Amino acid sequence: MEQIVGVRFKPAGKIYYFDGNDLELHLDDGVIVETSRGLEYGYVVTMPTEAEKDEENPMKPVIRRATIKDMAQLERNKAREKSAFDICLQKIEKFKVPMKLLRAEYTFDRNKIVFFFTSDGRVDFRELVKELAAVFHTRIELR
């Protein structure tokens, strides 16, 4: 048996399920989890429940409850996202890329910045990505 807990990364966002890792977790607790994007900070939104362990498709575990340091890191990331957004806008104008930037998100561990955008068609943003990677010294993803 494993303890399953629902975690949300954004208010009103999708709920993802993780192995509670035998941690004592409560609703609205901040937690650090491993996702396909890297380490992420989320909030517990469902009470932990017991479930059969699926050996073929194991759930990723909650790494730990969020600490005060983690909360401070989250706030620093939010501030950096604003700066990253502004810098990306400048680079979009510089390269005249036909896209509208929606938002920027750092992963919790700052291994990657994801820039969300819309465009009317396919966009060649290879030069933009190279420039952003040089500025931020981290992996860049455009979605």
Predicted regions located by residue number:
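Acidic-enriched and Gly/Ser
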Residues: M1-R143
